[in-house]
């Protein structure tokens, strides 16, 4: 399984990858993107089986990235991992087609719960 982690913070991308490992969701190919535009280009060029994205990024926000994917017919499971988690953001995420929104600070258990139906061994 190919997992794309999109976040403008390299440190946060590393934390997300470590948390995947702690949630027993390791062993998958992980691809990183620094912003929504780079992430969109990577997905359109090579696909992904799961996308974990920050909400606020330069060039293209996470929600705009998700909307662009759906507009291009890409139905890859998409989950936000972000420092904010307002009800309005959750509603926008769901309306755009996200499977969930994990708020920072997060735990391995939160990842396991949110992603277990998507991530295969």
Residue ranges and their predicted role:
Residues 10-31:
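Two-component/phosphorelay signaling modules centered on CheY-like receiver
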Residues 35-38, 61-64:
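Acidic catalytic/metal-coordinating carboxylates
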Residues 30-37, 108:
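Conserved Asp/Asn-Gly motif in the active-site loop of CheY-like receiver
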Residues 46-52:
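Active-site beta3 strand of CheY-like receiver
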Residues 64, 85-100:
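Alpha4 helix (beta4-alpha4-beta5 surface) of REC/receiver domains from two-component response regulators
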Residues 106-115:
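C-terminal output helix
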Residues 57:
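Receiver (REC) domain active-site loop signature in two-component systems and cognate sites
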Residues 54, 82:
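Active-site residues of response regulator receiver
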């Amino acid at each position: 399984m190919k997992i794309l982690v999109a976040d403008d913070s390299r440190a946060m991308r590393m934390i997300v990858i470590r948390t995947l490992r702690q949630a027993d969701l390791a062993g998958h190919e992980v691809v990183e993107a620094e912003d929504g535009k780079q992430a969109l280009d990577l997905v359109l060029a090579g696909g992904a089986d799961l996308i974990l994205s920050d909400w606020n990024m330069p060039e293209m926000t996470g929600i705009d990235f998700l909307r662009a994917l759906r507009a291009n017919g890409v139905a890859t499971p998409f989950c936000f991992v972000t420092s904010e988690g307002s009800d309005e953001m959750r509603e926008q995420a769901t309306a755009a087609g996200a499977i969930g929104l994990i708020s920072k600070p997060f735990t391995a258990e939160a990842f396991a719960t949110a992603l277990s139906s998507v991530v295969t061994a």
